[in-house]
């Protein structure tokens, strides 16, 4: 029988990519104030922000769309769009005031060259721009932080001041041999004289400023800034401890001061993106006295503090250990008036049956409190799904708001006055926008969801979750009895499954997971005729803290064997074409892919690795996360304690090398396509070069794509589209059509 045709020409794959890549992604939502019509009806405006790939402009465009939700206090009566989508150019941050009458917008404008781009902070009222402040011209600070790690844009409760985070203004520096410009503005009878120099520091123009690593380049020393909307005066807050970098700030009750998270930056900064384990604590700075107060334990890591509507309590995520880089978190509650901190939801070592498996989100939504300031809503991975949960802060009881659904995944965008805005998707259904009211306590499982924007399902994609139990010889002695899962996607109704090729995709991290949500690359491959196996090996988030802790010290072994076990079992059960199995992985998924073609060379006919770790030992001195991180297992993931003030001994270096894919180079024969970002700070591209040269020396088919301005994620539109097409052609060449 003839093999299943994957594609006849590259143009077909490009056409398919063009169609599916048009699916927009939700990035944010906020709710306007409650409005009562002259006829007694009540409605709220839902303002949503989306992103979409534009292949003509080769960029991600941002656009907004508004919807109206008519309601009767506890249920949606009618909901629908209010006008068409509008592209928003230059918007970096936006936030409505507490009353909803004002809106602040941080906007960039100007050229693209160095020093040409400017930042403006605008204040809008109804249909007009009320104020516009040229932050760049005022020179009170450097660029404003727009990221979700440090960045914030917060209205005071009085709506008279705006709080944000920006880079600290650096002193001017000049050469010891700088020639002074002459002052030619003097009168004709005066001799030209040197201009009065600025207070520039001689010899400091090449001083090294540490930044916060991958995707945080040039962000080094954040400061808290307050803008007086009426006067336009900007103040840089004093009182922040010298040893921490502030971020995620908001106004304290009564506008008496500012609450913020402070991250330790001594003795040096480590990469912070995707690393929730960075030592940090909750602080309060009084605006009158300029003194700070520590509000939490300062030996752990915290994230996303959120003030309750009654301004009495703050919830935040707390991580019980500074290793590994991401893990199960506690939900903590700080009472503003009693100064008492309590743990509302604790770490879950292991999921029991269908019970809650813990909190794994890295950030709580900005809007997460119920109207009565008693309950908190959030989303979290639960095994291979992502669900919405509500927790009662008084009793600690956790209830799923989306259990028993169709098996897809949910993301909470915001909740305000008990009206929730959420996103829902599946591997075959792009994101849909939904709203629903949070039911009263005790009835939370009865949410009635209404669609504001319903996506069309992609036909001929079937998917399901496979539960996998490692064989006895692969059990972890310290954490025995752990299982793991994989999401299997396959083309609909093939004439003969034995002719269907399979692409295996282990996720990055290693402490992250695949969930049953929309993913462009797997959907594309499935539409082209591939089965796609997405493996959540032991160590993935969503399966309990024990699963996460089972992996450090066992990378390159436990995770590799889990993926291989999943592949063999699925091939055996589904009877896919065993002669056409390929690997595709990025970051730690690339690390595993390179391991698999070395440890199991007979299984795989082709491999695509994106920014893979190939030699843990050689990467330790160049990555932004030498301790343990999203894509490299330098020390902690290799099974050793990390310390800022010491170097590993020879045995540790040897063991890191022993756990690396490059150890298995002599066995590799699978054709490999490497894709590297030249600006990758997490896994420096030299890792891929090292592996590439080792394969070239042994005449193994290998091709290298080096993207000059791309970072670790390879997510720029031009890079992402090019890398996918090259991956497809690589699979076509080495697996056959």
Swiss-Prot record:
Pfam families documented for this protein: APEH_N, Peptidase_S9
Entry-linked InterPro entries: 6-blade_b-propeller_TolB-like, AARE_N, AB_hydrolase_fold, Pept_S9_AS, Peptidase_S9_cat
Active site: 587, 680, 712
SUPFAM superfamilies: alpha/beta-Hydrolases, Peptidase/esterase 'gauge' domain
Known EC number: 3.4.19.1
UniProt keyword annotation of Acetylation present: yes
Disulphide bonds in the chain: none
Gene Ontology biological-process annotations: amyloid-beta metabolic process; proteolysis
Keyword Translocase tagged: no
GO MF annotation: an example: identical protein binding
GO CC terms, sorted: cytosol; nuclear membrane
Keywords annotated in UniProt: Acetylation, Cytoplasm, Hydrolase, Phosphoprotein
Compartments where located: Cytoplasm
Superkingdom, natural source: Eukaryota
Family as reported in the entry's similarity comment: Belongs to the peptidase S9C family.
Reported function: This enzyme catalyzes the hydrolysis of the N-terminal peptide bond of an N-acetylated peptide to generate an N-acetylated amino acid and a peptide with a free N-terminus. It preferentially cleaves off Ac-Ala, Ac-Met and Ac-Ser. Also, involved in the degradation of oxidized and glycated proteins.
Subunit structure: Homotetramer.
UniProt name for this protein: Acylamino-acid-releasing enzyme
Species per Swiss-Prot/TrEMBL record: Oryctolagus cuniculus
Gene this protein is translated from: APEH
């Amino acid at each position: 029988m003839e093999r299943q045709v994957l594609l006849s020409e590259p143009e077909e794959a490009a056409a398919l990519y063009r169609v599916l890549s048009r699916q927009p992604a939700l990035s944010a939502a906020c709710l306007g104030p409650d409005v009562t019509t002259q006829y007694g009806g009540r409605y709220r405006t839902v303002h949503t922000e989306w992103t979409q790939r534009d292949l003509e402009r080769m960029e991600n465009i941002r656009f907004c769309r508004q919807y109206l939700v008519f309601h009767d206090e506890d249920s949606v009566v009618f909901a629908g769009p209010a006008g068409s989508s509008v592209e928003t150019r230059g918007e970096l941050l936006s936030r409505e005031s507490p009353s909803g009458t004002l809106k602040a917008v941080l906007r960039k404008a100007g050229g693209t060259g160095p020093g040409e781009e400017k930042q403006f902070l605008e204040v809008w009222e109804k249909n007009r721009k009320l104020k516009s402040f040229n932050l760049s011209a005022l020179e009170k600070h450097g660029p404003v932080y727009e990221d979700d790690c440090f960045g914030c844009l917060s209205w005071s409760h009085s709506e008279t001041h705006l709080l944000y985070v920006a880079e600290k203004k650096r002193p001017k520096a000049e050469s010891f041999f700088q020639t002074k410009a002459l002052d030619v503005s003097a009168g004709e009878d005066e001799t030209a004289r040197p201009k009065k120099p600025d207070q520039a520091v001689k010899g400091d123009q090449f001083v090294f400023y540490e930044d916060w690593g991958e995707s945080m380049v040039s962000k080094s020393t954040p400061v808290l800034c307050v803008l007086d909307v009426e006067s336009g005066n900007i103040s840089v807050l004093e009182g922040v401890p010298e040893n921490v970098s502030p971020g995620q700030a908001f106004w304290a009750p009564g506008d008496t001061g500012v609450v913020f998270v402070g991250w330790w930056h001594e003795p040096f900064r480590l990469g912070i993106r995707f690393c929730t384990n960075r030592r940090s604590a909750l602080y309060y700075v009084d605006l009158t006295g300029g003194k700070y107060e520590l509000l939490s334990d300062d030996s752990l890591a915290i994230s996303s503090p959120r003030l309750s509507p009654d301004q009495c309590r703050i919830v935040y995520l707390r991580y019980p250990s500074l290793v590994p880089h991401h893990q199960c978190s506690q939900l903590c509650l700080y009472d503003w008036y009693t100064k008492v901190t309590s743990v509302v939801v604790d770490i879950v070592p292991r999921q029991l049956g269908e019970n809650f498996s813990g909190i794994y989100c890295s950030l709580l939504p900005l809007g997460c409190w119920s109207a009565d300031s008693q309950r908190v809503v959030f989303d979290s991975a639960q095994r291979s799904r992502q669900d919405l949960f509500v927790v009662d802060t008084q009793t600690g009881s956790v209830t799923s708001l989306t259990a028993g659904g169709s098996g897809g995944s949910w993301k909470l965008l915001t909740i305000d006055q008990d009206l929730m805005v959420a996103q829902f998707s599946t591997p075959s259904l792009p994101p849909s926008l939904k709203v629903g009211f949070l039911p009263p306590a005790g009835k939370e499982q009865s949410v009635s969801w209404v669609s504001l924007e319903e996506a069309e399902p992609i036909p001929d994609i079937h998917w399901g979750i496979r539960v996998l139990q490692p064989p006895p010889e692969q059990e972890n002695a310290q954490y025995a009895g752990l299982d793991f899962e994989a999401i299997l996607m396959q083309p609909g109704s093939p004439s003969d499954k034995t002719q269907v090729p399979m692409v295996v995709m282990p996720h990055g991290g290693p402490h992250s997971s695949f969930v049953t949500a929309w993913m462009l690359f797997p959907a594309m491959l499935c539409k082209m005729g591939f089965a796609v196996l997405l493996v959540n090996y032991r160590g993935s988030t969503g399966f309990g803290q024990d699963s996460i802790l089972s992996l450090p010290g066992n990378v390159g072994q436990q995770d590799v064997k889990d993926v291989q076990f999943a592949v063999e079992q699925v091939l055996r059960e589904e009877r896919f074409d065993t002669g056409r199995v390929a690997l595709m992985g990025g970051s730690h998924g690339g690390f595993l892919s390179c391991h698999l073609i070395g440890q199991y060379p007979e299984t795989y006919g082709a491999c695509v690795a994106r920014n893979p770790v190939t030699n843990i030992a050689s990467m330790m001195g160049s990555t932004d996360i030498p301790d343990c991180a999203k894509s490299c297992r330098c020390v902690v993931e290799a099974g050793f304690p990390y310390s800022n003030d010491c170097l590993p001994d020879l045995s540790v270096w040897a063991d890191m090398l022993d756990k690396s894919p490059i150890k298995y180079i002599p066995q590799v024969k699978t054709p490999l396509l490497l894709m590297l970002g030249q600006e990758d700070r997490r896994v420096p591209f030299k890792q891929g070069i090292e592996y590439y040269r080792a394969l070239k020396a042994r005449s193994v088919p290998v091709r290298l794509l080096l993207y000059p301005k791309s970072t670790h994620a390879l997510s720029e539109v031009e890079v992402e589209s090019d890398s996918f097409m090259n991956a497809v052609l690589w699979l076509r060449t080495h697996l056959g059509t």
